[in-house]
From Swiss-Prot:
It catalyses: 4 porphobilinogen + H2O = hydroxymethylbilane + 4 NH4(+). The porphobilinogen subunits are added to the dipyrromethane group. Its EC number is 2.5.1.61. GO terms for cellular component: cytoplasm. Pathway: Porphyrin-containing compound metabolism; protoporphyrin-IX biosynthesis; coproporphyrinogen-III from 5-aminolevulinate: step 2/4. It comes from the Bacteria. Belongs to the HMBS family. Gene3D superfamilies: Periplasmic binding protein-like II (3.40.190.10), Porphobilinogen deaminase, C-terminal domain (3.30.160.40). It holds the Pfam family Porphobil_deamC. NCBIfam families: hemC (TIGR00212). HAMAP family: Porphobil_deam. This is Porphobilinogen deaminase. The modification S-(dipyrrolylmethanemethyl)cysteine is found at residue 242.
Length: 300
């Protein structure tokens, strides 16, 4: 990389730029002389973010254009939210680094109410995540769960304009944008199980680029990698069979991976949960085992 500018492909959203800047700062910490440039790109998913349409944004819509930039050598690395990586990577690309995980929980955000249990019957709560909708409806079937699209700023404005009584957002996104004051409650995973990879920044690059792989290696966080490996195995297995709400969340306890997962119906009328523990080197295997268990129980 001597005398070369390392180009970081990123989405154009404020949060994506913030995450790319975090990677920029970490790389500069380990490689002070490295020249780095951010390369913001509008993705297919971004184009439809603010459209209140019934059409679901396709898988991979937030990363496809960034991957094209890597494949075409216009960028050296791409920075993603791990939860956006819902499709297999192209053969020529790899995901060598998962940065240390931020808070993986969801946040309850409201201008009037301290938590979801204090919302009056018929209150409108906003989220477009099927995972959140499913679990919220199961817990509070008397609420109106309404789709909520747009970036974080747009969603907060819709709350402020009174379109919603409350909304649910990822804690990590609010923290990165210095919007902690909006968080009324950090929702415990036992009450709202997080998405695969929530709170994790992932770095993608070309598989055969030894120089880049070497530069990125100090940013690799092993514990996060074990956790996401287990979580991703669940979603990879289940998404090949169905398009239902899925959640998977792993923690490490005493050198073991503790994985919780669920699958349900969007209306919350049916949720199947499971959990298990395994040695760290069997994290992925545990994910596949639990996913199979969920599918069998769900079909009964």
């Amino acid at each position: 990389m001597k005398n070369k500018i390392l180009k970081i492909a990123t989405r154009k959203s404020q949060l994506a730029i913030c995450q790319a800047q975090y990677v920029h700062n970490e790389l500069k910490h380990y490689h002070p002389t490295l020249s780095i440039e951010l390369m913001p790109i509008v993705t297919t998913g971004d184009k439809f973010l603010n459209i209140d349409a019934k059409n679901k944004i396709k898988k991979g819509a937030f990363i496809k254009e960034l991957e094209h930039a890597l494949i075409n050598f216009r960028a050296d690395i791409a920075v993603h939210s791990m939860k956006d990586i819902t499709v297999p990577l192209p053969d020529e690309l790899t995901l060598p680094v998962l940065c240390k995980r931020n808070d993986p929980r969801d946040a309850f955000v409201s201008l009037k109410y301290p938590n979801i249990d204090t919302l009056p019957i018929g209150s409108v709560i906003g989220t477009s995540s099927l995972r959140r909708q499913c679990q919220i409806r199961a817990h509070r079937p008397d609420l109106v769960v309404s789709n909520l699209r747009g970036n974080i700023d747009t969603r907060l404005k819709k709350l402020q304009y009174g379109q919603y009584d409350a909304i649910v957002l990822a804690v990590a996104g609010l923290q990165r944008l210095q919007l902690h004051e909006y968080i009324r409650v950090h929702i415990d995973p036992s009450d709202l199980l997080p998405a695969m990879g929530q709170g994790v920044i992932a770095i993608e690059c070309r598989s055969n680029d030894a120089d880049i792989l070497s530069l990125l290696s100090p940013l690799y966080h092993q514990e996060t990698s074990f956790r996401v490996r287990a979580e991703r195995a669940v979603t990879t297995y289940l998404e090949s069979y169905c398009h239902l709400p899925i959640a998977s969340y792993a923690e490490i306890e005493e050198d073991q991976i503790w994985l919780r997962a669920l699958i349900g119906l969007p209306d919350g009328s049916k949720i199947i949960r499971t959990e298990g523990r395994a040695p760290l080197d069997q994290a992925e295997k545990l994910g596949f085992i639990l996913a199979e268990d969920l599918l069998i129980k769900f079909k009964r």
